[in-house]
């Protein structure tokens, strides 16, 4: 079984792991009622709606 000769530094470990997270994109959805783009599971700041309920007063 292969065994590493030297301990890998935390910096090298972080650099290796950073390659996996390089191209993660955020998932953006279009709101059905207003047509605005927002993050999923977040309320629409323009209308103040979240899951069909009025949570905030809409901005004017």
Swiss-Prot record:
One of its GO terms (molecular function) is structural constituent of ribosome. The gene is rpmF. It comes from the Bacteria. GO terms for cellular component: large ribosomal subunit. This is Large ribosomal subunit protein bL32. Pfam families: Ribosomal_L32p (PF01783). One of its GO terms (biological process) is translation. Residues 1-20 are annotated as: Disordered. Keywords: Ribonucleoprotein, Ribosomal protein. SUPFAM superfamilies: Zn-binding ribosomal proteins. Belongs to the bacterial ribosomal protein bL32 family. NCBIfam families: rpmF_bact.
């Amino acid at each position: 079984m292969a065994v590493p000769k030297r301990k890998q530094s935390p910096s090298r470990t972080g650099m290796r792991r950073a390659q996996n997270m390089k191209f993660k994109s955020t998932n953006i959805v279009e709101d059905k009622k207003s047509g605005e783009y927002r993050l999923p599971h977040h309320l629409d700041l323009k209308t103040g709606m979240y899951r069909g309920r009025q949570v905030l007063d809409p901005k004017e």
